[in-house]
Amino acid sequence: MSAAESVDQLIERFNLAQGELVKGNAEPANELFSHREDVTLANPLGPTAHRWDEVAAAGEHAASQLRDGEMVGFEAIEKYITPELAYVLRVERAKAKVGEGEDIAPMALRVTMNFRPEEGTWKVVHRHADPITTPQPVESVIQE
């Protein structure tokens, strides 16, 4: 199987795993991450997780804040694949009950993921997700 086919297969598996995450189950997504020391996760709920134990815990925490959800769509922006490294930039859209809320709420995340082959299987080595999907004023970066 070519690198492009393998990465596309991993992305499809990750899409399905995200469907589980918005139902409160982090395990399928966590299985797709590298377990090596250089793996990272930067999600909207906290500081960057670095190393497998922190990444797994951050994924579990994110899943614990979501329930009764479903993925609505994935909007590909760019994808680049080499035999040794690949990345995808996209917008992920979902709806779920968030935190203590009882209403299903729409969510959108701008996501970058990096992948690499490890022992014959492609893995996620970095994921960054944030809720910025529309233009923002420069003042939005100010923290008081």
For the regions a language model picked out, list residue spans one by one:
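Short beta-strand edge/turn micro-motifs at domain boundaries
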Residues: 108-138
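A short, polar/proline- and glycine-enriched secondary-structure boundary/capping micro-motif
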Residues: 98-102, 134-140
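A solvent-exposed, acidic/Ser-Thr-rich amphipathic alpha-helical stretch
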Residues: 7, 20, 26-82, 91, ...
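A detector for short, charged/polar N-terminal pre-domain segments
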Residues: 2-6, 137
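Amphipathic alpha-helical repeat scaffolds
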Residues: 11, 15-19
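A short, structured loop/turn motif at beta-sheet edges
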Residues: 79-87, 102, 115-123
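Generic short beta-strand segments
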Residues: 90-97
